[in-house]
């Protein structure tokens, strides 16, 4: 397996280092490695699939320190082989080998990995925002310009114009407004909604190779975006942030 695939996989499920603890599940019949993860504040759920099982059999194991795993992987070459060590049918470590060098990463008991709640029936999404290269680039730059702002706000004015605002406040504030060009027939917003801008930025940057994705918004307070290519499938759910002044 290419080491870059593993690095991209960890970036996508960890949101570039925000989430550390996850469960890896190998599904050999589908040639996939799957993860589900959740942020500490429980405002984002991430479901990421790597479409390459690295020739592993069906196993599950916990990775409790993704940042350390990434640092250890950095000493290896471009091509990596993966092998588990098991004791009493439990994976206790994973060995990554490349060009005469190997690393052993000690896995965690699944009981210490934060559980990710099962998704119930999703509400209908009434707003769809195409994630064009231009929109993504502008949003990432806007978040960089207001690095201390962690909230994005979706609003609709009396004329029906949709905006995404970083730095929104009911009082005078530094803010950046982005016009929203929604998909036809999915351009309604029934109320003002707030989501975590930092998380959305990391979702977008960790999936920057994907095109034609859509950010879907529900007035029920849920946002969803899916990215798919030949190597990965990534689904993220953001929950509304309430009580924003």
Label the predicted regions.
Residues 1-17, 22-145, 153-245:
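DNA polymerase sliding clamps and clamp-related checkpoint/processivity subunits
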